[in-house]
């Protein structure tokens, strides 16, 4: 351990006495504890163990389950139905059985048996013959149909071909000129003008100043000297001038009150660095849950525990 501070082993905090955490299993000494027992005992390859049966199709080659029975692939359902109908037909010895008497009509609601009027023809369920419906025929045409849609083909539509009419370029400008000249010709004289001096509608502004303004005052520009200012006499030394005194400097006078000598506060004469007592060290601790799992499921009984997976 170095003279000052902690060692690297103490800083890590792993090299210390392990905690007394147990789940009730017996203690075996490290000397008698086997090392890598699974490498030379029991099976060398550990499989996944037994799997519980599942109704899913995962793990098979086909996505859907197919039934496979003996000679099922060679059966034809159509052929089997035909053979069954032939066997049933062979059981018929003669013709169909017909009773000696005909069907008796019921005497109840909806029948006309025993009534005076008998059945009404209009209420009969038989289909009434109807006359053959003749179609009215197509409409007759007064003129043969026109060919084409009419776009780009003259004299094909119902209306006649449009006759040519000239359209001068400056027609709108000429019409405007004619309207302006006709309007000016209707005017009798020129524009109406008054010979009076124009006046304002309201009183004059009393604050209006018609006289010319005085010239603006010129601001004197401050002159900036490039050369720094130097006083006429040199600067005085500290302490002032000593001319006229007996001594050039004042005589020394002792302090009336005695000054205490300060001592340096050093409690440790050897000047050693203070190290506090080390606190608790951190240690990697396994969880009790993981220890219980390792105890319950191990290399000896892993294949007897049913798997939860479906494949």
Swiss-Prot record:
Give the superkingdom in one word: Eukaryota
- Where found, per UniProt? Cytoplasm, Cytoskeleton, Microtubule organizing center, Centrosome
Per the record, its GO cellular-component terms are:
centrosome; cytoplasmic microtubule
Keywords (alphabetical) are: Cytoplasm, Cytoskeleton
Stored PANTHER family: UPF0602 PROTEIN C4ORF47
**UniProt family annotation:** Belongs to the CFAP96 family.
- What protein name applies here? Cilia-and flagella-associated protein 96
Source organism per UniProt: Danio rerio
């Amino acid at each position: 351990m170095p003279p000052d501070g902690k060692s690297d082993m103490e800083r890590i905090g792993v090299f210390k006495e392990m905690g007394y955490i147990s789940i009730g299993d017996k203690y075996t000494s490290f000397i008698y504890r086997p090392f890598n027992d699974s490498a030379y005992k029991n099976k060398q390859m550990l499989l996944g163990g037994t799997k519980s049966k599942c109704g899913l199709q995962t793990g098979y080659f086909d996505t859907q389950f197919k039934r496979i029975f003996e000679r099922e692939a060679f059966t034809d359902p159509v052929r089997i139905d035909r053979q069954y109908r032939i066997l049933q037909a062979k059981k018929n010895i003669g013709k169909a059985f017909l009773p000696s008497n005909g069907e008796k009509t019921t005497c109840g609601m909806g029948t006309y048996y025993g009534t005076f009027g008998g059945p009404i023809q209009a209420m009969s369920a038989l289909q009434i013959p109807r006359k053959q419906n003749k179609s009215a025929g197509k409409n007759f045409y007064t003129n043969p149909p026109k060919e084409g849609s009419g776009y780009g083909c003259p004299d094909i539509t119902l209306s006649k071909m449009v006759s040519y009419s000239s359209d001068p370029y400056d027609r709108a400008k000429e019409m405007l000129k004619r309207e302006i000249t006709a309007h000016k010709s209707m005017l009798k004289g020129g524009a109406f003008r008054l010979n009076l001096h124009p006046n304002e509608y309201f009183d004059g502004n009393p604050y209006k100043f018609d006289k010319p303004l005085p010239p603006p005052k010129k601001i004197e520009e401050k002159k900036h000297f490039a050369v720094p200012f130097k006083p006429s006499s040199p600067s005085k030394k500290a302490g002032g001038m000593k001319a006229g005194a007996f001594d050039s400097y004042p005589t020394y006078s002792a302090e009336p009150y005695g000054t205490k000598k300060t001592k340096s506060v050093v409690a440790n004469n050897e000047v050693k660095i203070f190290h506090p007592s080390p606190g608790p060290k951190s240690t990697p601790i396994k969880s009790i849950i993981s220890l219980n799992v390792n105890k319950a499921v191990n290399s000896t009984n892993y294949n007897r525990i049913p798997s939860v997976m479906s494949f």
